Amino acid sequence: MAERLAILGGQPIRTIPFLNRKTMGTNEIEAATRVINSEILSGFLAAPGSFFNGGKEVKAFEKSWAEKYGFKHAISVNSWTSGLMVAVGAVGIKPGDEVICSPYSMSASATAALFYGGIPVFADLDPETFCLDPKSIEEKITSKTKAIIVVHLFGGPADMDSIMKIAKPRGIKVIEDCAQAPGVFYKNKAIGAIGD
């Protein structure tokens, strides 16, 4: 191999530095402390209705998140994995459906599709963003492709314009995984509000 690795003085592939930012401030720490100190982590009362869907702090958080980012609804879940499971189920993935996903992500990107009997298909990444490369997405599409799971990484968004131009005309659903880029905007629109 003639080229040297970047770590050994060779030319780096990536030219844009990763964002290095603090993700939790005083308000978030105070809110979490308030809930923990109340000893009421959920409104669940073992009764029918929406009581299981979190306590008043959870409801307030969901409402403020939806308002802040322009979503019609915001529903909190216990983990990133659970969020992907809900999203993949919501778009109707069935056994044999192909779901294009990132090879550079937590395993839940692929296993959420597998849970519903879907087949994960890995597309290549854009070397600048480490998000899915739209050209590679297009190359991976078959008649069985039903969804694309876009993982926004390192506080930066994927190329959503190109991805939506590929997906929409074909009726392919786009699921945005924003766990590693919360509160990020793409061309003045909150990520998570662009796909399906």
Where are these regions (language model features)?
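Conserved PLP-binding active-site segment in aminotransferase class I/II-type PLP enzymes
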Residues: M1-T81, M85-G89, K168
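Short glycine/proline- and charge-enriched loop/turn segments
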Residues: Q11-T15, G118, G192-A193
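Active-site phosphate/pyrophosphate- and oxyanion-stabilizing loops and adjacent acidic/basic residues
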Residues: K63, D161, K189
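PLP-dependent aminotransferase-like
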Residues: G89-C178, F185
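Structured loop/turn residues at beta-strand edges in well-structured enzyme cores
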Residues: Y69, K94, S143, A193-D196
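Structural motif
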Residues: A66, V91, E139-K140, K189-A193
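Conserved active-site segment immediately N-terminal to the catalytic lysine
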Residues: E176, Q180-D196
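Residues that recognize and position ribonucleotide moieties
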Residues: K22, F130, G192
